């Protein structure tokens, strides 16, 4: 009996202590957490009254001002830059790698890291003020190579996006419990031509999980004259393979955004905002233009090239496009560029494939055997009279960007003449 009373008394004391701790936490939250509304003055001519507590990027997003963010607010892409002229506190260590000392002195911050805790005066690029968000409808979502989708969405009726070729859009990725590659991916949309690779590498065994909403950025492959159907090229980000000779996948999460997009079907709805970015052609310089790309980096380069030719009918500038792929079956939109070569004598398309390709040989497709940077060097620039006088537009995997920029630097090409859209 005595032991029972002691146990009950102990439980009672424990519950009282827990209750007191909860009360203390609630009181502390009330007095220490930001509460009430504050004012944010934007570009000196607009003020919004907003609740405290969220990041500046989230707060602006909720008020129709969409800062670019390719990483979903993780401080890794460094794109959500904004000047915080008053308020905001000290810059965080997570932000400093994205800015020069002069930019830090000029009060530049990352919107995803700056918390709204009081009145602010900020300055955002005027281009951001023109960004809109829409609920779009998926029109098609078909593979154009083994692991890349041509993802097309339609803007709502009557809506239009004004953009410069080379811009990108952002897709909202909702939280989801599980996307099962085998059950949730439409195998007909992957296509008979490519599904063998998925089975070979056991990719349908993968699953994806996303505990919280985020956003991802994708360059647009369409050019303005193609209307209000937005085309993105999206590569599936699978879990990395184990090092050989091991078989299987590493214990690393799959790509939450690409998994979501690959699961979408015609008729589905998706939230998209845009346009973003400054990877745009120089329309007036008169210089020779050279585009270099690989993989899903095709998207903004196609948009720029099609606009320069089909829309602007540029015939007074030399135009060259170098595109690299592992094999002919992994290259896409090729017909567009073969047709341009016929229509525009000043446009030249150079396809490079990593190794000898029997399929390309059987079809009589002209290609360079080797990597894109070697193709540029061996077939064109090594005999070019003045490579430093050309403009270069690059988009593709980081290794491609690095090897090409290193090579161009060795030729004496100024950094100002090299524009690129780098992605991982």
Regions found by a protein language model. Give the residues of each.
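Reductase modules of NAD(P)H-dependent flavoproteins
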Residues: 2-73, 84-105, 310, 315-424
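Fe-S ferredoxin-like electron-transfer domains
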Residues: 20-27, 97-159, 179
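Residue-level marker of beta-strand positions
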Residues: 55, 79, 168, 266-269
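Cysteine-centered iron-sulfur cluster-binding motifs in ferredoxin-type domains/subunits
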Residues: 68-78, 111-115
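Ferredoxin-reductase
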Residues: 139-266, 352-356
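A short, basic/flexible loop-to-alpha-helix module at the beginning of a structural domain
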Residues: 260, 273-287
């Amino acid at each position: 009996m005595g032991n029972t009373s002691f146990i009950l008394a102990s439980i009672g004391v424990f519950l009282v202590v827990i209750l007191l701790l909860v009360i203390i936490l609630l009181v502390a939250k009330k007095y220490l957490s930001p509460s009430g509304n504050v004012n944010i003055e934007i570009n000196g001519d607009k003020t919004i009254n907003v609740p405290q507590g969220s990041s500046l990027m989230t707060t602006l997003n909720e008020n129709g001002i969409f800062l670019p963010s390719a990483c979903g607010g993780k401080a890794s892409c460094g794109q959500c830059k904004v000047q915080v002229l008053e308020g905001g506190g000290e810059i965080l260590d997570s932000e400093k790698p994205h800015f020069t000392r002069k930019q830090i002195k000029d009060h530049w911050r990352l919107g995803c890291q700056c918390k709204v805790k009081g009145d602010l005066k900020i300055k955002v690029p005027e281009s951001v003020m023109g960004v809109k968000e829409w609920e779009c409808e998926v029109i098609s979502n078909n593979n154009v190579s083994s692991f890349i989708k041509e993802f097309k969405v339609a803007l709502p009726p009557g809506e239009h996006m004004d953009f410069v070729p080379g811009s990108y859009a952002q897709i909202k990725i909702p939280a989801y419990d599980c996307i099962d590659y085998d059950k949730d991916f439409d195998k007909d949309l992957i296509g008979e031509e490519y599904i063998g690779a998925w089975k070979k590498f056991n990719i349908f065994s993968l699953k994806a999980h996303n505990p919280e909403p985020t956003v991802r950025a994708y360059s647009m492959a369409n050019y303005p004259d193609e209307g209000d159907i937005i085309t993105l090229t999206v590569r599936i980000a699978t879990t990395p393979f184990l090092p050989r000779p091991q078989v299987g996948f590493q214990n690393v999460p799959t790509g939450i955004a690409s998994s979501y997009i690959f699961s979408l079907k015609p008729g589905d709805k998706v939230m998209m905002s845009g346009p973003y970015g400054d990877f745009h052609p120089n329309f007036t310089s008169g210089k020779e233009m050279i585009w270099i790309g690989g993989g899903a980096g095709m998207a903004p380069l196609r948009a720029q090239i099609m606009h320069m030719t089909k829309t602007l009918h540029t015939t007074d500038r030399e135009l060259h496009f170098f595109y690299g792929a592992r094999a002919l079956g992994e290259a896409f939109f090729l017909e567009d560029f073969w047709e341009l070569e016929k229509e525009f004598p000043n446009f030249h398309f150079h396809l490079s494939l990593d190794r000898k390709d029997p399929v390309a040989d059987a079809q009589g497709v002209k290609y360079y055997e080797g990597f894109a940077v070697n193709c540029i060097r061996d077939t064109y620039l090594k005999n070019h009279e003045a490579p430093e006088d050309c403009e270069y537009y690059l988009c593709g995997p980081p290794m491609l960007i690095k090897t090409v920029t290193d090579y161009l630097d060795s030729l004496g090409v100024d950094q100002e003449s090299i524009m690129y859209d780098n992605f991982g």
